[in-house]
Design a protein with these regions (language model features):
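Metal-dependent amide/peptide-bond hydrolase catalytic core
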Residues: 1-4, 11, 46, 74-76, ...
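Residue-level signal for inorganic ion chemistry
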Residues: 23, 27, 44, 193, ...
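Short beta-strand segments
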Residues: 97-98, 164-165, 190-193, 212-214, ...
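Glycine/charged-rich beta-loop-alpha catalytic/anionic-binding loops adjacent to active sites
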Residues: 115-129, 214-215, 355, 387
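Acidic/histidine-rich catalytic neighborhood of metal-dependent amide-processing enzymes
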Residues: 125, 131-208, 417, 421-424
Length: 424
């Protein structure tokens, strides 16, 4: 059967690539994901799955596990998530999770081809979200289409769900809402994030915040007499980077190599000033902070605020302490045991498909796997394609890796759903 499976995957590969192209053509930055969701609906309906649109409120999620809701001006009305599931009654045996939201395509003029016009070059597909993570939906569709050919009754007795969520890139509230409000869950979850065909079993804590700095404003002719708000904000960011080095020394991430940098400080945006010859009176720095897995979000927030206050208090140029506001992620770190049944079975499926065992690793970032693991004690692992330049210019996914990941996923689904419990 497995040779038949690989032949079926090869037969349907081009369909999966065309599906991915359609998804990339539908810009789905946070707040405007519905057009891409409708493409997902059409594809998975064609696979015989039942579709349920899950309403998604733009109101803040009142839950101490939640992140901060995005600004209202980013959000469109009538947002929704989608659960596609195999027909039948009863609970899901397995859930496949993916996120439809993508990050903005900054400076499109720097891209080789427009970010929302998919382009195939040198064995890759380029476009915003092609790798992170619309390529994951192509993997899922390809595996299911091939399995329908070789095992049409595979899901007759047990149900599979494929969940497309939003707000993964800023809060994780999409996955949290799907569980807390709509009860979409299963005993195990596979998230089709890009992992270079490895098993991403863990991630560090991540917090988003805005740091507002105020300073004396005035004519540029007096700029040498005091630091302006932008200068002071840069000192805060550099101070945080030094703080992160000290945190790493005190609290290294044991699941990562010593040479890696898990607690990165990223300055993503700066808003300041209204005139070139005026020293700005205020500046807002949007910063992403990585922190140790063993810290809670509440504890991390306190540590970060204390660090920022300490930097300002030690610098006489600050007229007052910065104002810190949380803006998105309040994500605790997570780790799935690499020897868990989910990890070992998925690794076995990969070994059968490719003759090599996948690398299990922790990344210095976060995924929605943390919500299943930390908040609901559901085993969850990320597995997916080979990505390049995620969040950057000319983001791309290796097309062959979509096929390779589908071969692994299809075997894993056979392991879970064949009535005799056969292993790939």
């Amino acid at each position: 059967m497995l040779n038949e499976l690989d032949r079926a995957i090869a037969t349907h590969t081009e369909e999966a690539f065309r599906f991915l192209e359609e998804l990339v053509r539908a810009p789905s930055t946070v707040g405007a994901e519905q057009a891409a969701m409708e493409i997902f609906v059409t594809e998975f309906e064609s696979l015989g799955l039942s579709i349920e649109r899950l309403p998604f409120s733009n109101a803040p999620l009142v839950d101490n596990r939640a992140g901060i809701t995005p600004p209202a001006d980013l959000l469109t009305d009538d947002r929704f998530q989608v659960l596609a599931s195999t027909p039948g009654d009863g609970a899901l045996l397995l859930l496949i999770n993916g996120h439809m939201d993508v990050v903005p395509a900054e400076s499109p003029e720097l891209w080789t081809t427009p970010p929302f016009e998919p382009a195939r070059r040198d064995g890759r597909m380029y476009g915003r979200g092609a790798a992170d993570m619309k390529g994951g939906f192509a993997i899922g569709a390809l595996a299911l289409r091939a399995l329908r050919d070789v095992e049409p009754d595979l899901f007759k007795n047990q149900r599979l769900g494929v969940l497309a969520v939003i707000e993964e890139e800023c809060s994780g509230n999409g996955t949290l809402r799907s569980i807390a409000e709509q009860g979409v869950t299963a005993p195990e979850v596979v998230l089709l994030e890009p992992t270079d065909l490895g098993l991403m079993v863990g991630g560090v804590g991540v917090m988003w915040l805005d740091i507002r700095v105020v300073a004396s404003s005035g004519h540029a002719q007096q700029a040498d007499t005091s630091a302006n708000a932008v200068d002071l904000g840069i000192r805060i960011v550099e101070g945080l980077r030094g703080w992160a080095v000290r945190v790493l020394s005190a609290e290294p991430e044991p699941s990562m190599d010593p040479g890696e940098s898990p607690y990165n400080i990223n300055l993503g945006r700066v808003h300041s000033g209204d005139w070139t010859s005026t020293a700005p009176s205020s500046a807002v720095f949007s910063v992403r902070v990585g922190y140790p897995r063993i810290w809670t979000p509440t504890g991390a927030e306190a540590e970060i605020r204390s660090a920022i206050n300490g930097i300002a208090d030690a610098d006489a140029d600050f007229p007052s302490r910065p104002v810190v506001t949380l803006t998105g992620f309040r994500a605790q770190g997570y780790l799935l045991d690499k020897d868990s049944v989910l990890s070992t079975d998925l690794a076995a499926a990969h070994l059968d498909a490719h003759g090599t065992s996948p690398l299990a690793f922790t990344l210095g970032s976060t995924t929605d796997a943390r919500i299943y693991l930390n908040d609901f004690e559901i085993p969850a692992v990320c597995f997916g394609a080979v990505a390049h330049d995620m969040h950057g210019i000319d983001e791309s996914v290796e097309l062959q890796s979509i096929v390779d990941a589908a071969r692994t996923l299809a075997r894993f689904l056979l392991m879970r759903f064949l009535p005799d419990g056969a292993r790939a």
